[in-house]
């Protein structure tokens, strides 16, 4: 399949690019450094023309736009290009924690991450309002980091996945396996899924 990947150079995006390429997919990377403006639906449409699947793994740190802006632009661009399938590297902060509420709203959630985390939750709301495209919002564990590719992960829904010790963790490499498996299977359309060990 032809996969257009926005954000192929970051920690997560580079792992996704490697995993998809290793599976024989044609991966076309689109990044800010190449001059692409993900907030311009016309540029998005041009970039995703002919794609079987679009994956968005961008970070908006210091970019001057919100993740909800990106969501609206991506969706508009996909519609213009006639592309149907979108997977989004989401955030964990909007996941529900044991006892109720979102991870973002817990007392221990780091203050310096709240702005970006709230943007991720707003973007998820944008995706959830869409019923004409096949999107999947993939929330990682609370802690995602470079590490070992074990091939093991668990999929969940709107609840934060924790292990028997109360930890929520995944390597970027295993998260990329989950993304690639979702690309290959075509499952979990118009849903948010969580991924953790």
Regions found by a protein language model. Give the residues of each.
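Conserved glycine-rich Rossmann-like NAD(P)H-binding loop of the short-chain dehydrogenase/reductase
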Residues: 26-32
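Glycine/proline-rich active-site loop of Rossmann-fold NAD(P)-dependent oxidoreductases
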Residues: 130-131, 145-153, 182-191
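Hydrophobic residues within alpha-helices
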Residues: 12-16, 74, 179
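Conserved Rossmann-fold NAD(P)-dependent oxidoreductase catalytic core, especially the SDR/UDP-sugar
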Residues: 33, 73-116, 125-129
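N-terminal Rossmann NAD(P)H-binding glycine-rich loop of SDR-like oxidoreductase domains
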Residues: 3-23
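Substrate-positioning beta->alpha
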Residues: 119, 168-180, 191
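Conserved beta-loop-beta element that borders a ligand/cofactor-binding pocket
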Residues: 125-146
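NAD(P)H-binding glycine-rich loop region in Rossmannoid oxidoreductase-like domains
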Residues: 34-81, 184-187
